[in-house]
């Protein structure tokens, strides 16, 4: 049994974390788009991403869509995005989007669609930080938004709470009962997984956040 305790932050398609405003829409207020690709994996990935957005709905009928989105592979870690609308069709955006890999590039392209059509920041290419508690122990993990690539950051077999992203999205602050058995604050580099103690004073150290 694995219990997920989420303290989730998203990393933007750029280096900095972003704050997303609450957006509530009725179905009739959603932006209808058509998504196409010669690669079925890319098409499915883009559709899964857009399905998470409250302001966009993917339709199969071109006549019902305000925009036509086409995403094609352009290398191992890049995708070609074209965006257009109208009858007759008019191309409005063409961009080669690079990423850490092809999947990340496709999600970044989806973020560009959100920015171009809704004038708001996308979040599909972000990374999530969360705590998973299993067998009485909790560890810190990161994942892409669709949970297709989950990576452990710690293996301490200790209670962990409250991960917080740094402003540049490269590290996390969290509270851990590692070593002392009492709550201490640590900072961990997401790429190297190097952990640094920040606050290990006597008493309770918790709730660390970046200012």
Where in the sequence are the language-model features?
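Conserved beta-propeller blade repeats
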Residues: 116, 157-175, 195-196, 200-211
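A flexible loop/linker signature enriched in serine peptidases of the S9 family
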Residues: 121, 132-140, 157, 176-184, ...
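Residue-level detector of Asp-centered blade-edge/turn motifs that repeat once per structural unit
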Residues: 120-124, 167-168
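Conserved blade-register residue in beta-propeller folds
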Residues: 83, 141-142, 187
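Short loop/turn segments that connect beta-strands within beta-propeller blades
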Residues: 144-148, 189-193
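Amphipathic beta-strand/beta-sheet edge segments enriched in Tyr/Trp
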Residues: 47, 63-112
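Residue position within the beta-strands of beta-propeller blades
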Residues: 127-132, 171-175
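A structural "domain/chain start" motif
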Residues: 12-48
């Amino acid at each position: 049994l694995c219990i997920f305790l989420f303290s989730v932050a998203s990393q933007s398609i750029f280096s900095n974390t972003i704050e997303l405003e609450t957006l509530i829409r009725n179905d009739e207020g959603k932006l209808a788009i058509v998504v196409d690709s010669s690669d079925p994996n890319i098409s499915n990935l883009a559709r899964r991403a857009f399905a998470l957005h409250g302001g966009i709905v993917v339709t199969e009928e071109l006549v019902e869509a305000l925009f036509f989105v086409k995403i094609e592979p352009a290398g191992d870690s890049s995708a070609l995005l074209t965006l257009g609308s109208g009858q007759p069709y008019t191309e409005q955006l063409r961009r080669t989007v690079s990423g850490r890999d092809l999947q990340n590039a496709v999600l970044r392209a989806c973020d560009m669609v959100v920015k171009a059509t809704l004038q708001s920041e996308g979040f599909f290419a972000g990374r999530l930080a969360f705590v998973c508690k299993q067998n009485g122990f909790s560890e810190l993990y990161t994942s892409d938004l669709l949970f297709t690539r989950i990576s452990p950051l710690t293996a301490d077999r200790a209670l962990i709470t409250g991960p917080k992203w740094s402003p540049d999205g490269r590290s996390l602050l969290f509270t851990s009962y590692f070593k002392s058995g009492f709550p201490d604050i640590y900072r961990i580099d997401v790429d190297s997984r190097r952990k640094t103690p920040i606050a290990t004073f006597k008493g309770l150290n918790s709730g660390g956040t970046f200012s």
